[in-house]
């Protein structure tokens, strides 16, 4: 089949790679314009653009899909399907109606739970036991299309947003390829409408959410730390400096909220209930360090405090 692929970040790379390596033809890639990045703020191509260039696939990088010239270019492809993965631009109904067999999205949650911008992080924060990927029809409403395929991934106490992201991207690639193969064979895909009574929304992360409140339970703080790794990274003050906390686990024990109880095996800090064992942390201008290495250069003692 002739497929147009719309995606931008790392999450969208495995599915594009799978389609490139398949019998399908990716005739055009849509991705967001290059953005300034790094200290020099040089324009940087999206990961999807880099992969498309590597394989010589034609690219479009419009600021909007409402532009008539852009729509004419997409229509000229006479594509069988449009595949979407974390593209980041609204796709107008006129574009959705162009492909012969429709438009299909890779969404990183088990819909209808966690529609929206940050499904991976919200699943972790909420303490969900599993997450997954839904292959769905694209409709004008946000993540509201009928569901075609779903794949699940358990959430463990060691998972971060990054580990889940990577696992879900691979599952999404596998499921989307299955869907496109079936679409080519049968000319249609069976789809199940979402149960609107079960819908929850995954609001975009706000940097203010990354501040650690030591009055919360250790389980909740562990999920916060892991959900905000690699962005925006949970943090607290330590001796007047902002300390970023990259990895932490909840353990049993008691101490005043924010007070260091022990530094013998990780840095154990009191919470509203239980202790948070900080395993990896970072001071301004420094590297991410395991707790043992951090303590070698930044001695801490029981009774020292995190937070104001």
UniProtKB/Swiss-Prot annotation:
InterPro entries: Fmt (IPR005794), Formyl_trans_C (IPR005793), Formyl_trans_C_sf (IPR037022), Formyl_transf_N (IPR002376), Formyl_transf_N_sf (IPR036477), Formyl_transferase-like_C_sf (IPR011034), Met-tRNA-FMT_C (IPR044135), Met-tRNA-FMT_N (IPR041711). It is an enzyme of class 2 (transferase). GO terms for cellular component: cytosol. Keywords: Protein biosynthesis, Transferase. Pfam families: Formyl_trans_C, Formyl_trans_N. (6S)-5,6,7,8-tetrahydrofolate binds at residues 109-112. Its EC number is 2.1.2.9. The keyword Protein biosynthesis applies. GO terms for molecular function: methionyl-tRNA formyltransferase activity. It catalyses: L-methionyl-tRNA(fMet) + (6R)-10-formyltetrahydrofolate = N-formyl-L-methionyl-tRNA(fMet) + (6S)-5,6,7,8-tetrahydrofolate + H(+). SUPFAM superfamilies: FMT C-terminal domain-like (SSF50486), Formyltransferase (SSF53328). NCBIfam families: fmt. PANTHER family: METHIONYL-TRNA FORMYLTRANSFERASE, METHIONYL-TRNA FORMYLTRANSFERASE, MITOCHONDRIAL. Attaches a formyl group to the free amino group of methionyl-tRNA(fMet). The formyl group appears to play a dual role in the initiator identity of N-formylmethionyl-tRNA by promoting its recognition by IF2 and preventing the misappropriation of this tRNA by the elongation apparatus. Belongs to the Fmt family. This is Methionyl-tRNA formyltransferase. The gene is fmt.
